[in-house]
Amino acid sequence: MKGHACTAEVAVLGAGPAGVATACALRRLGHTVTLFGCGRRGTLEGLSARALALLQHLGLTHAAACAMQPAERGGRWGGSPVSAGHEFIVDRLILDRALRDDAAAYGVCLEEEFALAIEPDAGGYRVRTRSGTYRAGVLIDARGRRSGRALGRGPSLIALSQRLSAVRARQPRTLIWPLDDGWCWFASDGAGGAVVQLIAASRGLARGATPAQRLRECLEALAACESALRDARLEGEPHARAASARLSAAAPAPGYVRAGDAGVSMEPLSGHGLYEALSSAGAASAAAHTHLAGHSWEPVERFLTERACERWRTAIARAAAFYEQQAAATPTTFWRQCAGAYAELLEPRAPEERPEGAWHLRPVLNGSVIEMRRVAVTRERPRGVWQVDQVELARLEEFLLAEPAAGVAQAARYLACSPAAVASAVGWLRAHGLLKSGGHAPQTRAVNR
């Protein structure tokens, strides 16, 4: 196609988990999608049980099949042994290949090249590559941490990793171990594949020791709890990448959406990176679908921005807790500075004066569309709650105000929901001061916007 333009409804930049999941979701909605990107450098990564469940839920069956035998977790943190939980060890090169197979199965057009430039175009965007120019109505940026200017950033960290050889075969396993100036992670897939990774302050890696020397220090520390590492040797070349938690604009322009790490990148210590990347696909695909349908961009931008800020704050709180725990056990400069930096990012905002329960018009994710709906805003749920047990709260409240003598059964018929679900929603409204009488309050499951 060199020299002329190829057109699709959506261009997705980045063929990792977030990009592929979003591209496949858009194909299920009937849109034409071109996906740009190549597989990452081969290394081992941890895939949590809930990330695996999400791959399966999203229909990414080839990628889900990469998770084989669960790996036990071990090591030390906060002065205590780590032994709880497990994760699956996947080779990122194989995972990315499987993701591309999933994309092909859904009919996504895959271009194994990178975008050299992105330019606004009439009604959309132009993507320039080495082979030519592509046009699309919507642009999904899923290129990871390097995408866009950071609006928020955690401590400046870098991850240094390298493959290992001469690791004795055993069951899949991961280990975490704190150092005075960082922490290291080891993963073995049980079939001879193994990797060691060091996370340290960016400035700390320039303190004189070579990358290979620093990684050998990690191996020596890890060998204290894993005898199989005593004879391990570094293989190939070390690989460095940015590892700072990062927040970017989720919707920088109409028809332009950031997904996965491009919008919110997690602190590596949290172990939730792949899950968060996959979970962004629903909102990103709905944003694209809503824009292509000709609806207003303002609710889409607001929804994506508020969602990203909420995910960012959750990620920062998780990181702050981890670093504070280790700083108490190892009060060195690295741990105290990282813990302090996250605590500063987490400083409480001035609280809004808000009654216990109030109704507001807010954007919500309604299936595959983002639209404005009345939601119940509470102190615990400042973004608002739209549904409880799949019952739309505003419609329920409107019905009960119009029919004050009606019972749960009548409301259930009106809303086409089960009486049990309606009773649950009535109980939730009463508990938050949004309904003065009627119903009971069983256990409920609230749905955020």
Regions found by a protein language model. Name each.
Residues 2-18:
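Beta1/beta-strand and adjacent pyrophosphate-binding region of the FAD-binding site
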Residues 289-373:
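C-terminal helical "tail/cap" subdomain of flavin- and related membrane-associated enzymes
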Residues 104-230, 247, 264:
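Predominantly flavin-linked oxidoreductase catalytic cores and closely associated redox partners
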Residues 117, 155, 206-286, 290-328:
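FAD/FMN-dependent oxidoreductases across multiple families
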Residues 52-100:
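A conserved beta-strand/loop capping segment in the N-terminal third of enzymes
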Residues 38-58:
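Conserved N-terminal glycine-rich FAD pyrophosphate-binding loop of Rossmann-like flavoproteins
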Residues 337-400, 423, 427, 437-449:
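Acidic, low-complexity/disordered tracts enriched in E/D and polar residues
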Residues 15, 27-45:
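Glycine-rich FAD pyrophosphate-binding loop
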